Amino acid sequence: FEALSWLLDNWHLTAAGKNGRERAVLESAINTLLRGFSALSAGGADAWVLISAATRKDLRNPKGNEEVLAVDVSGFAPEGDDSAALFIVKAYRLGWRRVVAFAWRGQRFCGSGLGASSGGFRIDTYGNPGDYLGSGLDGAHLYVHGAAQDQLAQIMKSGKLVIYGDV
């Protein structure tokens, strides 16, 4: 996973340059890898666990060895009560400290709504997160492994926003 992420983040340094086809292959490989993790409902044995819009009702606090919540955001609403952004806030409030959210296709407000003093929480995004990413950020670290849209980090008080692609 780390090697694929590095390649995705540094693809402009490779011989492929800015070839979108190679980037799409890397994103597909990352999505396939993340979708291969055990479901959160399986319970506590694995460090990385997977949840999606279809299984969102299974969200709970981390147990046992669980450290990273991989969230397939492809089925979530772009914004509102059923959005990926609010789902990530719920995960944070339940005690998750790292979320890897992937398959973004324009869903908005990632990293917003975490509340004051969200230090120690990390979100990694893969795909194409929508605008208002990191707005209201107050301590959390947000890593965008790709391009980001407009309205980034509005009213950002503290934390970190790293974008490995274009803005």
Predicted features along the sequence, with ranges:
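Charge-rich, low-hydrophobicity low-complexity segments
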Residues: 1-167
